[in-house]
Amino acid sequence: STALAYAFAKCGMLSRNRGGMGGYAEYAFGKSGSFLANYAYCVSLLIANIAIAISAVGYAVALFGLKTTPFETCLLTILVLWICTVLNFKGAKITGLISNFTAWGVIIPVAGISVIGWFWFNPETYISAWNPHDLPTFDAISASISMTLWSFLGLESACANSESVDNPEKNVPKAVLGATIGVAVIYILSTNVAAGIVDNAELVKSTAPFGLVFATMFNGTVGQIVMGLMIMSCSGSLLSWQFTIARVFKSS
């Protein structure tokens, strides 16, 4: 993921084409290559945005103690997607302001677990969660690579939004590399610490894993506060991604 981030950063420094990754592909493959790159990227964003919306709904359901059917979850997910789409009508400035604020909803709990979660860390719980399906080493690595790349979907988002960025030749590479490295450190720490606090079986079943971890560390009230923060964060993230996918469609 870091190598990909570096490649995107270099492209951002050298490219003079519009359209982010599609613009990069255009140098070698022309307009058709640009369209195919953007088309494939949009397909991945459609899936990612739905996943983020479902996460927001999952945290909300857990926060309010609701029980929803798959159909009700689908309707709530569609509603969240539309709300974030409508909020983008005001343009990049409003989207940026809202996203900058809501980002703290994930920074606070994730950074918090990374720093203070070690006081509740149980090595035995962590070891039991390590490779729970007892896959051979290389099979486990192969299975995790695709999940890792999926987890870091977003390292290229600054490139996709380069037309909305001031001085993109300098700011896009900084954003891509800095954000990727920062997120990698924080999320690797937080997820590993969480795996040593709550049993793997409970984490897998939970629709609000960070809330569950904080509830285990402190109490249910703290867990609910974290769920509220994560709802805010997921909504802000979805807002940015809806903006991104619109820009990619437009440039295609």
Question: What are the residue ranges of the model-derived segments?
Answer:
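Hydrophobic transmembrane alpha-helices that form the core helical bundles
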Residues: 2-81, 85-89, 94, 230-250
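Helix-loop-helix junctions that connect adjacent transmembrane segments
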Residues: 67-72, 101-228
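Short amphipathic alpha-helical coupling elements at transmembrane boundaries
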Residues: 13-16, 20-30, 97-100, 160-174, ...
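Transmembrane alpha-helical core positions of polytopic small-molecule transporters
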Residues: 1, 46-50, 85, 148-152, ...
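Generic secondary-structure boundary signal with a strong preference for alpha-helix termini
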Residues: 21, 32, 42, 60, ...
